[in-house]
């Protein structure tokens, strides 16, 4: 997808219900896409109530701010309440609603599909003894992994992950298959 003149734009939407309730009470994921970084942000939500959506949006927006990503425009689905609109005005200069029936204009739909496909692959690859109620704890690692596979739109020679977090140090955070059983050796007497 070639993006032209959408600097500092954010798209967001929520996924459908996850089949398992997580140990933290989460059932949904809010996915946000930042056009400059080409980065997909994922934040778990307990339900699709206004309070949970605002909490997830605020968490994602704070992460964008910490990374130095500007957001001047927020494009979202055509369902939005006055409370949600007011919270956005504090953070973003303008917002735009995708017209009903024009979901192909919401890049977040494509980001959701990419994240869902990747996360299904992650879940399919976990060990058979992995407790599925821990699925939301895999989100951070899945987000990191998916963004290590994408290039930034602003600086195509670096990864989307590096655009947001800086270069990944594989010695500090090695990547192993998610949800795999591990054995830890503990020396006696320590």
Feature-to-residue mapping (PLM):
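Retroviral integrase
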Residues: 1-117, 163-190
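Charged, gly/pro-enriched flexible loop segments at helix/strand junctions
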Residues: 124-188
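A polyampholytic, Gly/Pro-enriched intrinsically disordered region
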Residues: 114-126
């Amino acid at each position: 997808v070639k993006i032209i003149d959408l600097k500092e734009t954010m798209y967001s939407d929520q996924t459908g219900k996850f089949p398992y309730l997580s140990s933290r009470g989460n059932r949904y994921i809010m996915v946000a896409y930042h056009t400059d970084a080409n980065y997909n942000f994922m934040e778990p939500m307990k339900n699709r109530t206004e309070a949970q959506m605002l909490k997830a949006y605020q968490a994602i927006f704070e992460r964008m701010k910490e990374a130095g990503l500007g957001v001047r425009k927020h494009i979202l689905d055509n369902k939005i309440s006055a409370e949600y609109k007011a919270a956005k005005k504090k953070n973003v200069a303008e917002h735009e609603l995708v017209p009903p029936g024009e979901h192909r204009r919401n890049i977040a739909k494509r980001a959701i599909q990419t994240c869902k496909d990747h996360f299904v692959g992650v879940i399919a690859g976990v060990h058979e003894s992995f407790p599925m109620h821990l699925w939301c704890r895999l989100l951070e690692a899945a987000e990191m992994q998916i963004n290590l596979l994408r290039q930034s739109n602003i600086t195509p020679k670096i990864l989307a992950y590096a655009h947001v977090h800086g270069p990944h140090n594989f010695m500090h955070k090695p990547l192993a298959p998610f949800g795999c059983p591990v054995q830890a050796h503990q020396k006696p007497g320590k």
